[in-house]
């Protein structure tokens, strides 16, 4: 569970601050922006190096070209992990595909051993520990236990949080391009948390079928149900998934 959060950028980062505070996150939240004085009442630091210490979680809402530099600095200072909001990576198509792939490879290299979620990722809500790395309003409430949801669509994730009928949501993960951390990794992390009673999946693509199979078998052995919906099964749907999160 994150004990501290750093947010980078302005669009989306302000909501991450506001929603974490509204959810009841009790740890320090730092805002980093070189040109803003404050975000949501929190004084902005100028750069990563101004942080008092490495954050447990970082919400990186800077543009695609700046993302690798920010991630490299976070990795160097020992941050726990980062979530990348920006698009403009491997999901790009046609003549921009090479540009996007190059950006994504540079991002992966910059992260090193530091976990990154995304890029092209809407966000993550941890309703158990009150941490919200999310660029918008949502319907989650603090809970002591519940289900974990993993989706590659921010729109689906947002709408699911707004439902009034259903099981309480403990985690809402949107995965984006799965450049490094993938669905199997998140399933494993959820299975390590005894507060998660079931897992729901909305899948566009599975990068590592062997790891996914192992995670699913582990869930079975722990008697944690997994309910999965796989999209992109028809040629038209596969084309949409490819342009959405570069997944098949």
Stretches with model-predicted labels:
Residues 1-248:
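Catalytic-core regions of core metabolic enzymes
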């Amino acid at each position: 569970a994150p004990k501290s959060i750093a947010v980078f950028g302005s669009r989306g980062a302000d909501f991450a601050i506001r929603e974490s505070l509204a959810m009841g996150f009790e740890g320090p939240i730092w805002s980093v922006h070189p040109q803003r004085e404050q975000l949501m009442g929190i004084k902005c630091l100028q750069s990563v190096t101004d942080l008092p210490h490495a954050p447990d979680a970082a919400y990186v809402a800077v543009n695609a070209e700046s993302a690798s530099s920010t991630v490299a600095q976070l990795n160097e200072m020992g941050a726990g992990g980062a979530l990348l909001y920006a698009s403009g990576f491997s999901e790009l198509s046609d003549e921009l595909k090479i540009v996007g792939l190059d950006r994504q490879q540079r991002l992966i290299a910059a992260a090193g051993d530091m976990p990154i979620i995304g890029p092209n990722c809407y966000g993550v809500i941890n309703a158990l520990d009150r941490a919200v790395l999310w660029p918008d309003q949502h319907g989650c409430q603090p809970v002591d236990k519940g289900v974990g949801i993993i989706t590659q669509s921010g729109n689906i994730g947002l709408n699911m949080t707004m439902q009034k009928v259903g099981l309480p949501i403990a985690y809402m993960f949107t995965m984006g391009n799965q450049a490094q951390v993938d669905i199997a990794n998140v399933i494993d992390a959820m299975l390590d948390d005894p507060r998660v009673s079931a897992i729901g999946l909305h899948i566009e693509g599975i990068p590592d079928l062997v790891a996914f199979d192992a995670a699913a078998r582990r869930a079975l052995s722990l008697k944690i149900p997994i309910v999965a919906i796989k999209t992109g099964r028809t040629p038209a749907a596969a084309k949409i998934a490819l342009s959405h999160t570069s997944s098949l």
